[in-house]
Amino acid sequence: MAYQSRNNVTNYGYFRNWMFMLQRVTGVITFIFITWHVFETRVQVALGNVEHTDLGVLMHDLVQNPWVLAAYIVGLIAASFHFANGLWAFLVSWGITVGPRSQKVSTVVCMGLFVVMSVMFVLAITSFANPEFAQLPEGV
């Protein structure tokens, strides 16, 4: 879908056209990000390269690299936007928000959800840089 749809934001720079284009872009970014994240964490545990209890230390080590941290932040924000905008599209396509006023209200609510989720995810990923995650606590 991301590659088949025809974006026309240069001809018609309407808000919803931009949201349509960003939904496709963030979908691709989110797919790449989730694939990479699952490979770095769950697949490594399944292969026996990392113990499940060491995932906090692994994440600490990953976010010490500023490029990796930036990639995580971009991926998390893209996933948050993709979810929130997809929720808006779901509400419209299922006939829950039919009129212009209800669509405007749902736009504000969904974009508010995007901001809240993005802030929470960025705070969560940056917390792994805390030295407390550098090693496992005693007795674990």
Whereabouts are the PLM-identified features?
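Membrane-embedded alpha-helical bundles that constitute the cytochrome b-like, heme-associated redox core
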Residues: 1-140
